[in-house]
A protein has these predicted regions:
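Long amphipathic alpha-helical segments
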Residues: 1-142
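C-terminal regulatory/effector modules of DNA-binding transcriptional regulators
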Residues: 117-277
């Protein structure tokens, strides 16, 4: 809801810096971001006179931050990339940075690699840096120890984990009990552990078409777990770019972004059935 609200204000003509400052002001008045009641959800911002004064000078928009991160990583300039991301996290909510800066940067890097504009080494460095940066955030997002257990993993043979890491961070910040199971999970072993540990929901991420056959096998096997299979969801770039592939996967498509997946997870777990042991 928060990201949709920010986008609605920007779409209605408000500068993102004003929207974020407004959100900060609302959070301060409500004694915390989780207590904020967001006004103007229909996309109409308050009149300019009602918005808080801009409190940040020389704010760069998300597009400039994306370009800065990409250029720094392709120069192997880790220090500059870190400085830009630190700036971004200081300006915007974490979820906004994930959806509007980290994800677009990753997409641009991937597209440039596919076009042959950058080397495999450059792509690996950039992707690994972003994964490591998110892993630091993940360790700081403790989540909860109660409620339905959610497992998040990358598909078998899937080595790109940024999307899955973002999802785990968002879910924990939303109050869910989440375990991140890693990338390139083995089908048979994962099914056995799911049968034993009995998570309420399993969410799987994929980015490349060549992982789809194994992912299809895995989701079908998860659906056959007795006496009660977990809820199964899936998502990732490959399903945005090739929506026809969704027909081969058992379970629910969780949406085009990690943040949409959080909202769909909330809805599915409310509907049940789920386990809490």
């Amino acid at each position: 809801a928060m990201i949709r609200w920010l986008k609605a204000q920007v779409d209605a003509g408000m500068a993102i810096s004003q929207a974020v400052s407004w959100l900060d002001s609302l959070a301060e008045e409500a004694s915390g971001l989780e207590n904020v009641t967001l006004p103007g959800l229909n996309g109409s911002p308050l009149r300019a006179a009602q918005t808080p004064a801009q409190t940040r000078l020389d704010v760069r928009n998300s597009g400039a931050l994306v370009r800065g991160v990409v250029n720094a990583l392709l120069r192997f300039d880790e220090q500059q990339a870190e400085a830009i991301l630190t700036e971004a996290f200081g300006l915007y909510p974490l979820e906004y940075v994930g959806e509007e800066i980290v994800t677009p940067a990753l997409v641009e890097i991937g597209e440039r690699w596919h076009k042959g504009e950058i080397s495999v080494t450059m792509e690996h460095f950039a992707t690994n840096y972003l994964s490591q940066r998110l892993a630091v955030l993940l360790r700081g997002a403790a989540g909860t120890q109660t409620g339905p257990l959610v497992w998040v993993a990358c598909a078998p043979s899937e080595l790109h984990e940024v999307g899955a890491l973002l999802l785990v961070i968002y879910l924990r910040r939303a109050g869910h009990r989440v375990h991140y199971m890693g990338k390139d999970i083995p089908v048979e072993d994962f099914v056995q552990e799911t049968q034993r540990a009995r998570p309420a929901m399993v969410l799987l991420s994929a980015s490349m078409p060549d992982v789809i056959p194994e992912l299809a096998t895995l989701t079908a096997s998860l659906a056959r777990i007795e006496p009660q299979p977990p809820l199964v969801g899936y998502g990732g770039r490959v399903f945005r770019e090739h929506p026809e592939l969704r027909d081969s996967i058992t379970g629910m498509y969780m949406g085009d972004t990690a943040y949409e997946a959080v909202e769909n997870t909330n809805e599915r777990l409310r509907m049940g059935p789920h386990r809490t042991e």
